Each structure stands twice: as C-alpha cells, then as structure tokens.
Amino acid sequence: MRILGLDFGSKTVGVAVSDELLITAQGVEIVRRKSPSKLRQTLARIEEIIAEYKVDRIVLGYPKNMNNTEGERCEKTKEFGDMLARRTGLEVIYWDERLTTVAADRSMMETGIRRENRKEFVDEIAAIFILQGYLDYLSNSRS
C-alpha cells in the first residue's frame, strides 16, 4: 500500500509518494499543466503514477488561508480532488497545506539551492511536506 501526495497549483502539480511501510514520503515529479483550464493531461499523468506505484489513497494539499478560511484556491483544489476521485475511484484526503511552500523554500535555501533554481522544485518539495505530515499523523494515531 502506498499513498500519493499532491500539491496542486495553477501551473504545476507537485507529486510525492510514500514508501510501502507508510513511514517516509519521496518526491516523484512535477507535472506541468499545459493550460490551467484543461486538466485531462494532468489527470492522465497522475493516473499513470498511481498505477506505477500501486497507490490506494491520495492526500491533496488544501490551501486554507492563515485565518482558517477557505478562498478561491480551496474551491479549485476541491474541484480537482473531486475529478481525481471520480477518475481513479480512490479516496482523496484534503490535508491542510498552510506554510508547506514556505517550509519547502526554506529547506532548499538551507541546502544552498539558488533562488532561481528553487522555483523548479518547490511544488515537489511541498508535496513531500504535505504527504509526510499525513504519514506522521497516521503514525501518531496508531501509537
């Protein structure tokens, strides 16, 4: 059993996957969206990743505002998650992603990755943070 973690953005979707023991999250790739309004190719690529890694659940970052309200980005994310659930038949869990992009950017800065290169990886790293947060939650709830 593996879990897929996604960071859904207007231009890219960061993708991470858990190990089979559900302990760690690893980055897989960044799916580039050709057109923000057309999701077919994006969904098709994610379905390929689901099949390749034998995923049975999806954790999708949910971009609440800092004051815990839901804005337009939450609506778009929910629409994407609903499409994903319909197409794959898998459960989609919405996971609070506040500050994951900041944490991803900070971790890359600490490893010496230059600012212009960080943009390339921030969504994938954010997907890792989202999924790792969920995996840690699962681990703690089992203890």
From Swiss-Prot:
UniProt EC number: 3.1.-.-
Name the major location. cytoplasm
Give GO cellular component annotations, separated by semicolons: cytosol
What superkingdom does the record give?
Bacteria
Tell me the compartments it is located in. Cytoplasm
**Which EC class does it fall in?**
hydrolase
- GO MF annotations in UniProt: nuclease activity
Which GO biological process categories is it annotated with?
rRNA 5'-end processing
Keyword field contains Hydrolase? yes
What SMART domains does this protein's entry cite? YqgFc (SM00732)
Q: Which UniProt keywords apply?
A: Cytoplasm, Hydrolase, Nuclease, Ribosome biogenesis
Biological function: Could be a nuclease involved in processing of the 5'-end of pre-16S rRNA.
Protein family according to the UniProt entry: Belongs to the YqgF nuclease family.
Its recorded name reads Putative pre-16S rRNA nuclease
Q: Which organism is this protein's natural source?
A: Agathobacter rectalis (strain ATCC 33656 / DSM 3377 / JCM 17463 / KCTC 5835 / VPI 0990) (Eubacterium rectale)
